[in-house]
Amino acid sequence: MKWVKNAVGYWCEDILDRKYLGQKIGVSVLDTGMIPHPDLAGRIMGFDDFVNRRKRIYDDSGHGTHVAGILAGSGKLSNGVYAGIAPEASLLAAKVLDDSGNGMVEYVMAGIRWVLAEQKKKNIRIVNISVGTQPGLDKAEEERLLEGVEELWDAGLVVVVSAGNYGPEPGTVAVPGSSRKVITVGAVDIAGRTGGAGREKWDYSGRGPTEDCIMKPDLVAPGTFITSCNADYRYRFRKPYTVKSGTSMATPVVSGAIACLLSKYPDMSNVEVKLKLRASCIPSEQTQGWGMLHVGRLLSAGI
């Protein structure tokens, strides 16, 4: 995570003084589930499984646990090396995708309804959705999904969604990242290039505009070769961390930054958060919406 944090201007005074690291901020993660990895221990407020209806918390894919570690991992098993962006935020895990990372719109909608029911009780302020539909989904189903994420937004939640990995052609932002209301995140690599390491096979980050000519993604963050929590760490010969790439990995970088912001300014509305993000991004020569996330500028009172 070192290069990720360097790339997004993470090491500002508020972070170095450990003042605003997501304290008292709840973040819901709609994904493949989550395990109580030591880096997340004690901060998972709840879990529900809308795929297999199991009661015990689990993640049979590893995707959701990796996302959660980027967002809020403490770095306990790495002496802080792989700590997430908001290591004191709390998490609410909704399993809406199966062990292959696939799912039905109904699973996501059920997860959304659950988050809305838990919002006030758990002080959920942010919803991280590292989920995107594959091209060719029925239009009616796309509309249901868009209505679902916009219902979250209208309830006052900050909704952060991945742009999808179907780039680099125009018009490749996945639903529900195409929603005008939500904050949509694309991915850059270590050199700041959109969607990968300068080779065609890594040039994956979804591009706008949407069918309605909306500029997307809204901003970008590092998403290529990201080291975070490994859901299989308990098995023999498995390491506590693993590497993944995608806009799914860039999205929790932004969600974590927003958790830090809300721990400093807890009265901010979701619209105010979005405007602060827009004002604080570092513009780029590439097609990257507002530009690159910059945590120091985001937390600054003067921007």
List each language-model region with its residue ranges.
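Subtilisin-like serine protease catalytic core
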Residues: I15-S28, T32-G46, K55-E106, K122-R125, ...
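Anion (oxyanion) recognition and catalysis
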Residues: L21, E150-D154, V220
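C-terminal subdomain of the subtilisin-like protease fold in secreted/lumenal serine endopeptidases
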Residues: I124-N128, S263-I303
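Extracellular S/T/G-rich loop segment that most often corresponds to the catalytic His/Ser-adjacent loop
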Residues: D31, G177-S263
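Substrate-binding/access-modulating region of protease and related hydrolase catalytic domains
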Residues: L97-K181, E211-I214, Y233-S245, M249-T251
